């Protein structure tokens, strides 16, 4: 029976792929694949029959998922933002993925807030990020907006490489993300001006990257994906280009950052013991420690000890300690071991033995930790994980292949993706019981209906409460949404027939309908976590904000450029006047004095007017040119070379 369902699902999906081909008549341009990570993001594109992972403007193929606001009002994204974390910790935002789609009361949010250097506040029962955006202005951002800024950076990285606009993308999420987190990620794409054609699960994307060129026979593949902030395990079968997820499990709140945190806590305690001082009071010191601990952790993947040296760490004192691999492992051993539980669960759910697994694929930067590799190897009785895949880039690689399929690229072959819903979905029935409609690990897209009835006589309304989770009582599961079906004609309890239908689309997003079979009366809800999700108005406002920010960034850059032009013009003149070999030796003392005075005046003005407008900078430069040009012309005869070796903007203006 199960085999039949899968085949049916495959046909269903092939149908969906065909339907997609119909949709494809609209030109989507080049679709990019984006791995939106907790700590780093990565973008790829399918071009000329192969995937290109695109380097950013710093030449790096992965970009930190960081956004910062400087005191001057400049917004930095990526490497530039991460590089100034220690000098501006309160206004450097990271880890938005740990907050996205969660409520304020979520225990993991409350735990995270303790360690984040920026301010997280409650707004509409959700965590919002509050920062100073320069000029004494404070602004709150939804986690979706911060993620949107990172997505914008990835979009621009792709555009710079492709030389054209990018409007459509495939974005990946942890397989264990729930409905709210998926929907919020889609919203982030919208705010960034991207049409997110498909949300795909990270381990599935990694499996595509691994298995794309492996066409022989059916294989069982276990993907173990441990990144900066999330952990997923998925078991897939790959058979001639058909990728079917059989089971998935994980923890959306476990990753490299948690390992860093353990080491930081260890050193903070140690420092207090040695000096009696509590470093936690100093945000900058904590962020310096964070940066150095992360470096040491990376070093320990290839060596047995690393030194952590921080100059003027706290109250002017230096910090110098050694971290050994053994100590690092001891501090994190419980977390490392906890990664084996989901592996066990996935095997149980798919009715497979350890020996049935053909390949183990390690994904995510944290799988470079030797202890993690050892635990995985021991769990599978000494089987070596497969090595042929870059753990940082695999997810973006797979997303780019899926993007190639969606943009109708012929070279992707007949790739078919069968994914599953990670959590059981159901409704609450009398006594707070969770009645399951779609069990977890059901292949999506899927549709399931069941008939329910009323609990009391003449009941005019039924309230449908939709939950996700594995526990038998709804109070222990996660409420997705609630809606009412009204206008049920009076009848004894148990007589009315109410058909409840659950339908999940390819993005794993759920729609629930309820219909009174007697009257044909219908109501439906697309589970978009109304209480937890941005409204269309909010999304529109955020899209406008994002455009405004981009505009402001552009203006700010122009202002800085014109300021720099004036500054380099003035200093270049100053140097030449002071150089006896150049201008200085050719000017009359009167002209020299006039020029020196004019140049000094502009340099002084610049020092006290850093925040002037573009127009002011231009005007001051023009004033200076009006004094300098006649003197130079007199000296060289008109049409002579300009005074500075590099600047000839005045000539350009004349054209």
From Swiss-Prot:
There is a cross-link at residue 354 (Glycyl lysine isopeptide (Lys-Gly) (interchain with G-Cter in SUMO1)). Residues 1-81 are annotated as: Required for interaction with ELAPOR1. SUPFAM superfamilies: Actin-like ATPase domain, Heat shock protein 70kD (HSP70), C-terminal subdomain, Heat shock protein 70kD (HSP70), peptide-binding domain. The modification Omega-N-methylarginine is found at residue 493. PANTHER family: HEAT SHOCK PROTEIN 70KDA (PTHR19375). The interdomain linker regulates the chaperone activity by mediating the formation of homooligomers. Homooligomers are formed by engagement of the interdomain linker of one HSPA5/BiP molecule as a typical substrate of an adjacent HSPA5/BiP molecule. HSPA5/BiP oligomerization inactivates participating HSPA5/BiP protomers. HSPA5/BiP oligomers probably act as reservoirs to store HSPA5/BiP molecules when they are not needed by the cell. When the levels of unfolded proteins rise, cells can rapidly break up these oligomers to make active monomers. Endoplasmic reticulum chaperone that plays a key role in protein folding and quality control in the endoplasmic reticulum lumen. Involved in the correct folding of proteins and degradation of misfolded proteins via its interaction with DNAJC10/ERdj5, probably to facilitate the release of DNAJC10/ERdj5 from its substrate. Acts as a key repressor of the EIF2AK3/PERK and ERN1/IRE1-mediated unfolded protein response (UPR). Belongs to the heat shock protein 70 family. This is Endoplasmic reticulum chaperone BiP.
């Amino acid at each position: 029976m199960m085999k039949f369902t899968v085949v049916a699902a495959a046909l269903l999906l092939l149908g969906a792929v065909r339907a997609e081909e119909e949709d494809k008549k609209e030109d989507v341009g080049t679709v990019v694949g984006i791995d939106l990570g907790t700590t780093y993001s990565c973008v790829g594109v399918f071009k000329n029959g192969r995937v290109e992972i695109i380097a950013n403007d710093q030449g790096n193929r992965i970009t930190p998922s960081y956004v910062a606001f400087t005191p001057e009002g400049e917004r930095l994204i990526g490497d530039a933002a991460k590089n100034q974390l220690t000098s501006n910790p309160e206004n450097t935002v990271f880890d938005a993925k740990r907050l996205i789609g969660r409520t304020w009361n979520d225990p993991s949010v409350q735990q995270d807030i303790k360690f984040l250097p920026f301010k997280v506040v409650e707004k509409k029962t959700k965590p919002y990020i509050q920062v100073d955006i320069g000029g004494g202005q404070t602004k709150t951002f939804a986690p979706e907006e911060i993620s949107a800024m990172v997505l914008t950076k990835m979009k621009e990285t792709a555009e710079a490489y492709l030389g054209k606009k990018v409007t459509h993308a495939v974005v990946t999420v942890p397989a264990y993300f729930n409905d709210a987190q998926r929907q919020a990620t889609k919203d982030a794409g919208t705010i960034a001006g991207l049409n997110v054609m498909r949300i795909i699960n990270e381990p599935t994307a990694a499996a595509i990257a691994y298995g794309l060129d492996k066409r022989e026979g059916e294989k069982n593949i276990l993907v173990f994906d441990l990144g900066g902030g999330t952990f997923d395990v998925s078991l897939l079968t790959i058979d001639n280009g058909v990728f079917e997820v059989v089971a998935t499990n994980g923890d959306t709140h476990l990753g490299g950052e948690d390992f860093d945190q353990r080491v930081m806590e260890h050193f903070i305690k140690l420092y207090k013991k040695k000096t009696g001082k509590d470093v936690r009071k100093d945000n900058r010191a904590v962020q310096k420690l964070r940066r150095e601990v992360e470096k040491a952790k990376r070093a320990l993947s290839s060596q047995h000890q690393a030194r952590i040296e921080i100059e003027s760490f706290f109250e002017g004192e230096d910090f110098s300690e050694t971290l050994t691999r053994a100590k690092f492992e001891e501090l994190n051993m419980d977390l490392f071991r906890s990664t084996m539980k989901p592996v066990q669960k996935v095997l149980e759910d798919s009715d497979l033995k350890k020996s049935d697994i053909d390949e183990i694929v390690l994904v995510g930067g944290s799988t470079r930790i030797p202890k993690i590799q050892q635990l995985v190897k021991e769990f599978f009785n000494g089987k070596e994980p497969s090595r042929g895949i870059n753990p940082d880039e695999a997810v973006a690689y797979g997303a780019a292949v899926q993007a190639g399929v969606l943009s109708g690229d012929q070279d992707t072959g007949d790739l078919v993706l069968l994914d599953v819903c990670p959590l059981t979905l159901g409704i609450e029935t009398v006594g707070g019981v969770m009645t399951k409609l779609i069990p977890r690990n059901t292949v999506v897209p899927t549709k399931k209906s069941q008939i329910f009835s009323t609990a009391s006589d003449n009941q005019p309304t039924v309230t449908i409460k939709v939950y996700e989770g594995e526990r038998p009582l709804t109070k222990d599961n996660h409420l997705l949404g609630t809606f009412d079906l009204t206008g049920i004609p009076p009848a004894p309890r148990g007589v009315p027939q109410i058909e409840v239908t659950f339908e999940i689309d390819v993005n794993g997003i759920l729609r629930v309908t309820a219909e009174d079979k007697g009257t044909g009366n219908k109501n439906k809800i697309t589970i978009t976590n109304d209480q937890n999700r941005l409204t269309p108005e909010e999304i529109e406002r955020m899209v406008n904000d994002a455009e405004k920010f981009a505009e402001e960034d552009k203006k700010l850059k122009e202002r800085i450029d014109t300021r720099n032009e004036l500054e380099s013009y003035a200093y270049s003149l100053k140097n030449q006047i002071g150089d006896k070999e150049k201008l200085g030796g050719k000017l009359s003392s009167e002209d020299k004095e006039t020029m020196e005075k004019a140049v000094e005046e502009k340099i002084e003005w610049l020092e006290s007017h850093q925040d002037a407008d573009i127009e002011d900078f231009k005007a001051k430069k023009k004033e200076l040119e009006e004094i300098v040009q006649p003197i130079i012309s007199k000296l060289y005869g008109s049409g002579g070379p300009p005074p500075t070796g590099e600047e000839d903007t005045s000539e350009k203006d004349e054209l």
